[in-house]
Each structure stands twice: as C-alpha cells, then as structure tokens.
Amino acid sequence: ALHQNYPNPFNPVTQIRYDLPEKSNVTLLIYDILGREVAALLNGEQEPGYHSIMWNGQNRSGQAVGAGMYFYSIQTGQFRQTRKMILLK
C-alpha cells in the first residue's frame, strides 16, 4: 500500500511511506503533471514491512523542480498505485 506523502503540500522535502506484504522488487517514481518522469527514488528489492523514503524536490540531475502538482507511483510485480502531491515554492 502506498500512503499519502507528508507534509503535503511540501517545501522543500516530503516523506513517502509504503507497506510491503512480502519481499518485492519495488520501483518508486516521481512524475510531473504531463506524465514525464522526474526522478526515480527506488528501484530494487525490499523486505516486507513498513518503509519510507524522502524526496527533496529535485530531478534526476539534482536540480530543483518547479512548484506544482507531482505524482508518485509505486510498482511491485502486478501491483501499481499512484498518488498526487503538491510542491510549493
């Protein structure tokens, strides 16, 4: 399960929390409102349980992204869930 980020809206950092029922290969991506991938926060195997990861509002190149709505998406096998978050400047 993918939980709502906190804080939301955020500036400059937010925490993304998720639960895994079993050991899984996990991909966690950030997208802009046009569906373009902004950042990949996670791509690898994780143990079951409660996890959290921080996003600092930066893209893959380490540059700060602009204010606005973003989406974060988790995928594990056949499961995929997406939520929205807002970055304020």
Feature roles, as predicted:
Residues 1-6, 10-31, 40, 52-55, ...:
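Glycine-centered coil/turn sites that cap beta-strands in beta-rich domains
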